[in-house]
């Protein structure tokens, strides 16, 4: 294990480069640095030291990562809470942090699904009603929305006069 701060500069610079493009989780940075130290004299303890230094500098913060991730996907490519949770878990975010975030910040899945479907129904205007309905269920289902949520959203769209379906 390398104790000298200068010896850790290599890893620190690699981590900064990796963080330059977008926010990352601790696990993503750890895995990235682990690949970089293969066939070198660095150890996982050195990686942990670098990660601690990044956390102290507030360059690595899983809570902030969750906020940024959910905010980005709520605006740009809405997904259900279930899908967002699974994606965050894949990125190595602690389940307790995710649950804590969603307890503090409610995600209005119906509203997200409504906005998504409203846009899509304009594209599907020339398709017959039955196919549009199937497309709506498939489209929102792939984004993790429940059957009940999809059904409510379609009824809401129908009531608002945006679409006409014979359910």
Each language-model region and where it sits:
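An alpha-helical, amphipathic repeat domain used for nucleic-acid recognition
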Residues: 1-167
């Amino acid at each position: 294990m390398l104790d000298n701060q200068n010896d850790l500069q290599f890893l620190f610079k690699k981590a900064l480069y990796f963080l330059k493009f977008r926010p990352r989780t601790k696990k993503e940075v750890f895995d990235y640095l682990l690949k970089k130290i293969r066939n070198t004299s660095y150890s996982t303890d050195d990686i942990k030291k670098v990660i601690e230094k990044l956390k102290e500098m507030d360059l690595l913060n899983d809570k902030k990562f969750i906020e940024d991730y959910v905010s980005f996907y709520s605006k740009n490519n809405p997904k259900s809470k279930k899908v967002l949770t699974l994606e965050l878990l894949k990125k190595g975010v602690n389940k307790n942090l995710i649950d804590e975030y969603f307890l503090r910040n409610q995600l209005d899945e119906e509203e997200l699904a409504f906005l998504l479907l409203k846009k899509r129904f304009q594209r599907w205007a020339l398709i017959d009603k039955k196919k549009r309905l199937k497309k709506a269920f498939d489209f929102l289902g792939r984004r993790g929305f429940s059957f009940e949520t999809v059904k409510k959203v379609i009824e809401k769209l129908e009531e608002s006069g945006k679409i006409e379906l014979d359910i």
